């Protein structure tokens, strides 16, 4: 019996590498199970992992500190990098369609947070180092805490006690920082539910429309010549001549009275109607369109790009229409239909809808690859290479005018920026950054859960003592105010005054507060990745500004 007790103590209580893995796994598993509980319509989800870690640490569970720090930081790096890869392809298009405005709103939230912090500094008399710890916890921004501690240490190398208090203030306010944003987002959704019904995608979508050629100037011109007349991207996918449907080539001649089916951006249909003469009212975008019946003698197949050498190649360089007499009517990328423009850069995993004669479609399938099983093979070289670049980039010091100490983005800021760049531009350099949706979700969930479990175990030992005794309750109250007030004000203004969608506003708030747990809550409530795209759009700049502001506040008020 004694041997069993000693063995159990060794496995669960004595800090070691194995014991840390066991405890961390137990905390994560129990937290995930509790995260399924709902209070009304609100569920904290994976945030429960953090609270279970705090409870375990409070009741005396200790782990190997080195292992715990590694697990926590490695989980954070995996999460932010995978998030960057996910939203990378749509990140820069989103900047052109509202991203700059979202960043300005996000900066307004950051500025309001620090103005409130200055106000509390004079009203409550809390020291600025402790306030920076409170702000770091209330906005779940641990890199800002690290930057403030570094600045304080450079000002006063003997400020060890103050630095420890800053970390404790962060730990005490962190839970309500997580929960407060989730509560604020839930309140915004309840108060303004109708905003959810509006939908306009950040990504360009393919829109089908039929036209009759009534413009005499087009009679006898080739498809290539007609395409040059309009400075907007569109593709003629089918031509009806004398009642017979054909797949057009660039040299096909169009005649007065022909009917054509074109794919373009929806906003360009009015210009196409002016060009061709008359637009038919039939809705070609209905999901119940029987394309096989439309094409009759033609074959329509969805082919998947699995040949690595095509990664990053422009669609027009393949010359599929002219060489094989087939037409590409759709390009599906991660569930988003893109306009099959000749300048579109193809990516591994893109699904192309190809229409033409059976044998020609088969030849195109051989060129594209169309072997779905190949997509299941992970491209780990690019994955780990991106992690290396992200961590290195996060350690690069940036020197700003008027700030004596260098600024670093750290493990939270560096990897997400590199992930975005890899996802957006990797294919142009023939880097295979494709990750299946399920694999990307696994990486993100695994990373953030590991981070939360480690953070809870690391910060829970003195959590309740600090709340009950000393200034703990004051810190908690100040932190909750810093979390809720700017979030509700900016969120209300974004939705009500600026007429932004809820998912974009929620993603902006999560990114501005560096709150991936709240982002996970939002994603569990909504369809699509609109919130994740906006999160990654505003996260780098808001993170950078918060780090700078934290250091400036210490320099001015400490």
From Swiss-Prot:
Gene Ontology CC: one annotated term: plasma membrane
Main location: membrane
Membrane topology according to the record: Multi-pass membrane protein
Annotated TM spans: 15-32, 39-61, 76-95, 104-126, 166-188, 383-405, 409-426, 446-468, 473-495, 533-555
UniProt record, GO biological process: potassium ion transport
Database matches in PROSITE patterns: RCK_C
Domain of life per record: Bacteria
Protein name as it appears in the record: Uncharacterized transporter PG_0562
Organism per entry: Porphyromonas gingivalis (strain ATCC BAA-308 / W83)
Lineage: Bacteria, Pseudomonadati, Bacteroidota, Bacteroidia, Bacteroidales
């Amino acid at each position: 019996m004694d041997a069993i007790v000693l063995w159990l103590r060794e496995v669960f209580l004595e800090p070691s590498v194995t014991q840390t893995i066991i405890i961390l796994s137990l905390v994560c598993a129990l937290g995930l199970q509790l995260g399924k509980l709902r209070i009304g319509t609100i569920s904290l989800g994976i945030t429960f992992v953090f609270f279970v870690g705090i409870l375990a640490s409070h009741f005396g569970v200790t782990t190997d500190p080195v292992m715990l720090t590694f697990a926590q930081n490695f989980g954070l790096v995996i999460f932010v990098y995978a998030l960057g890869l996910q939203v990378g392809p749509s990140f820069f298009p989103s900047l052109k369609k509202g991203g700059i405005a979202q960043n300005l709103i996000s900066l307004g939230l950051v500025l309001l947070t620090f103005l409130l912090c200055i106000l509390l500094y004079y009203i409550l008399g809390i020291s600025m180092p402790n306030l920076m710890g409170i702000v770091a916890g209330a906005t779940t921004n641990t890199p800002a805490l690290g930057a403030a501690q570094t600045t304080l240490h450079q000002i006063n190398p003997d400020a060890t006690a103050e630095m420890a208090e800053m970390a404790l203030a962060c730990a005490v306010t962190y839970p309500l920082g997580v929960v407060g944003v989730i509560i604020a987002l839930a309140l915004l959704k309840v108060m303004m539910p109708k905003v959810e019904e509006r939908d306009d995608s950040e990504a360009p979508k393919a829109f089908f429309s039929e036209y009759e050629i009534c413009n005499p100037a087009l009679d006898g011109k080739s498809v290539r010549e007609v395409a040059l007349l309009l400075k907007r991207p569109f593709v003629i996918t089918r031509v009806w001549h004398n009642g017979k449907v054909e797949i057009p080539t660039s040299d096909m001649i169009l005649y007065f009275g022909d009917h054509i089916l074109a794919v373009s951006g929806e906003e360009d249909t009015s210009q196409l109607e002016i060009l061709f003469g008359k637009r038919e009212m039939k809705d070609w975008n209905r999901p119940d369109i029987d394309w096989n019946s439309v094409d009759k003698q033609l074959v329509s197949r969805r082919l998947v790009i699995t040949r690595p050498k095509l990664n990053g190649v422009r669609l027009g360089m393949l010359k599929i229409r002219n060489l094989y007499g087939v037409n590409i009517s759709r390009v599906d990328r991660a569930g988003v239909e893109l306009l099959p423009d000749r300048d579109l850069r193809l990516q591994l995993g893109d699904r192309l809808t190809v229409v033409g004669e059976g044998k020609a479609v088969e030849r195109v399938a051989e060129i594209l690859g169309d072997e779905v099983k190949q997509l299941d093979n992970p491209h780990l070289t690019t994955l780990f290479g991106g992690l290396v670049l992200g961590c290195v980039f996060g350690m690069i010091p940036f020197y700003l005018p008027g700030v004596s100490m260098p600024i670093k983005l750290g493990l939270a800021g560096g990897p997400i920026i590199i992930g975005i760049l890899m996802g957006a531009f990797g294919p142009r350099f023939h880097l295979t950054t494709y990750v299946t949706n399920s694999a990307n979700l696994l990486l993100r969930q695994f990373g953030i859960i590991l981070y939360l479990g480690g953070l809870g175990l690391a910060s829970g030992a003195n959590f309740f003592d600090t709340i009950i005794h000393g200034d703990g309750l004051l810190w908690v109250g100040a932190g909750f105010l810093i979390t809720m007030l700017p979030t509700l004000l900016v969120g209300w203004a974004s939705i009500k005054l600026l007429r932004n969608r809820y998912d974009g506003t929620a993603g902006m708030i999560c990114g501005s507060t560096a709150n991936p747990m709240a982002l996970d809550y939002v994603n569990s409530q909504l369809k699509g990745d609109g919130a994740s795209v906006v999160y990654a759009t505003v996260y780098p700049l808001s993170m950078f500004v918060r780090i700078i502001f934290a250091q400036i506040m210490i320099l001015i008020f400490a």
